[in-house]
Design a protein with these regions (language model features):
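Active-site "cap" helix and flanking loop/linker of ATP-utilizing ligase/carboxylase catalytic domains
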Residues: 2-70, 83
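Short secondary-structure transition/capping segments
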Residues: 19-32, 74, 81-87, 122-132
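Generic long, charged, amphipathic alpha-helical segments
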Residues: 61-96
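Generic C-terminus detector
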Residues: 83-84, 89-135
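Aromatic side chains
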Residues: 1, 5, 55, 76, ...
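Residues in well-ordered beta-strands of folded domains
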Residues: 2, 49, 66, 76-79, ...
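Glycine-centered flexibility sites
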Residues: 6, 31, 54, 62, ...
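General structural feature for long, well-ordered alpha-helical segments within catalytic domains
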Residues: 1, 9, 13, 17-21, ...
């Protein structure tokens, strides 16, 4: 079995965790039960992966990415590199943009807006993320 965090699920779930993650890890490692139930922040999160065109098949590397610093949300780098002071693509799943808001619909709207700030000729993202959940 696989005993690690999933990617990109972790980047979306962990911002909502209110409980102390070290306490959780310690209890699990020591075989103890948690003293308190897990607590979660009362907001929703959405994450949209930015992937290299061609992923999961063949894709080019080295395309310059701009606008990451303009995103109002968290940007987790997955397949990026620094080249001559600029961020470039270096993998298939390049980054994930995660946004939070009071409702799932608002988080989805915000995330799609923020993803639009990222500029790179060699990136694509899915536009159906979260749609089924808000219908």
């Amino acid at each position: 079995f696989n005993a690690r965090f999933g990617d990109p699920e972790t980047e979306v779930v962990l911002p909502r965790l209110k409980s102390d993650i070290v306490e959780i890890f310690s209890a699990v490692a020591d075989g103890w039960e948690l003293e308190h139930p897990l607590e979660w922040h009362d907001f929703s999160t959405v994450g949209v992966v930015l992937a290299s065109k061609g992923y999961p098949g063949n894709y080019a590397k080295g395309a310059v990415i701009e606008g990451l610093d303009e995103v109002d949300g968290a940007v987790y780098h997955m397949g990026t590199a620094s080249k001559e002071g600029r961020i470039v693509t270096a993998g298939g799943r390049v980054a994930i943009v995660v946004c939070a808001a009071p409702t799932l619909g608002e988080a989805l709207e915000k995330c799609n807006r923020e993803v639009g700030k990222v500029r790179c000729d060699n990136l694509f993202h899915r536009t159906d993320i979260g749609r089924k959940a808000i219908k």
